[in-house]
Amino acid sequence: MSHPALTQLRALRYFKEIPALDTQLLDWLLLEDSMTKRFEQQGKTVSVTMIREGFVEQNEIPEELPLLPKESRYWLREILLCADGEPWLAGRTVVPVSTLSGPELALQKLGKTPLGRYLFTSSTLTRDFIEIGRDAGLWGRRSRLRLSGKPLLLTELFLPASPLY
């Protein structure tokens, strides 16, 4: 099962450097904290609509593969993050199987819990980078994060209803 927003997310083209953009736009795109928390600060109830979740092989993650360790399998989670039931963000998380050990095994069991609720409670969370992307008038970003030094890649597309616009 797929969703048009996730097709567009995968079409994002990334800037080599942070572009000169409006301060408010950069504030959203370069946010280091939880996007879930930012949405809740808008006075909204945040929920997850699950699109796809499960193990995939390298051929299903061509955009992410150069940014992650080469492994036989990866945990893929594709969601819509909704505010008061309206989709504000499409998210795609790719986790190498080697990351899924110890406490990080919980990444497979998030269900309808927003990823940010898990990530930003961890004292071991670090971020290697944020890249800004754009496709057909929509903005997105991707970040390689680490939990206990173990990598995962998070890509987010801000949908038209998002307060980013």
UniProtKB/Swiss-Prot annotation:
The alphabetized list of GO BP terms reads: pyruvate biosynthetic process; ubiquinone biosynthetic process
Q: Matching InterPro entries, A to Z?
A: Chorismate--pyruvate_lyase (IPR007440), Chorismate_lyase_/UTRA_dom_sf (IPR028978)
Metabolic or biological pathway, per its Swiss-Prot or TrEMBL entry: Cofactor biosynthesis; ubiquinone biosynthesis
Q: Does the keyword Cytoplasm apply?
A: yes
The residues that hold substrate are 35, 77, 115, 156
Q: Which SUPFAM superfamilies match?
A: Chorismate lyase-like
Q: Which domain of life is it from?
A: Bacteria
Question: Chief location of this protein?
Answer: cytoplasm
Top-level EC class: lyase
Q: Give the enzyme's EC designation.
A: 4.1.3.40
Q: Where in the cell is it found?
A: Cytoplasm
Q: Which GO terms describe its cellular component?
A: cytosol
Q: Does the keyword Nucleus apply?
A: no
- Name the HAMAP family on file: UbiC (MF_01632)
Q: How does it assemble?
A: Monomer.
* Protein's UniProt name: Chorismate pyruvate-lyase
Q: Which organism is it from?
A: Escherichia coli O17:K52:H18 (strain UMN026 / ExPEC)
Q: Which lineage do the record's taxonomy fields give for this organism? A: Bacteria, Pseudomonadati, Pseudomonadota, Gammaproteobacteria, Enterobacterales
